[in-house]
């Protein structure tokens, strides 16, 4: 009886470990994206993972020479915009490391694995033009005023 109980306990333990590993591995199956945002002349690399309606967003702001000026991680609630390939991200302020520098981020999907993210209040047509022309035309010309 003791041996049967021990064998059953061992099998149960193995099952629990396997279940735990599966549960831990499940969040790894997230959609990863990389992109660049340009705000006031500074380039910011963005790396984010989406899972359900929550997003973890890692941002690294660099100067034109590529030196890191600031980097942070925060968690956002993802609000998809069904009319476009856009996600509005609202910071989850229950996270102690939530950055209030970026109240709302809008992420635009420009292609497979390519995203453009802007703080909502800073998003302007001119900045979109700067990004898109640099991205797809290779250069940027100041628009006529």
Curated annotation (Swiss-Prot):
Q: What name has this protein been given in UniProt?
A: Toxin coregulated pilus biosynthesis protein H
Note the superkingdom of the native organism: Bacteria
What is the protein's species of origin?
Answer: Vibrio cholerae serotype O1 (strain ATCC 39315 / El Tor Inaba N16961)
| Its biological purpose | Involved in TCP pilus biogenesis.
Question: What does the annotation give as the result of altering residue 122 to Q?
Answer: In strain: Z17561
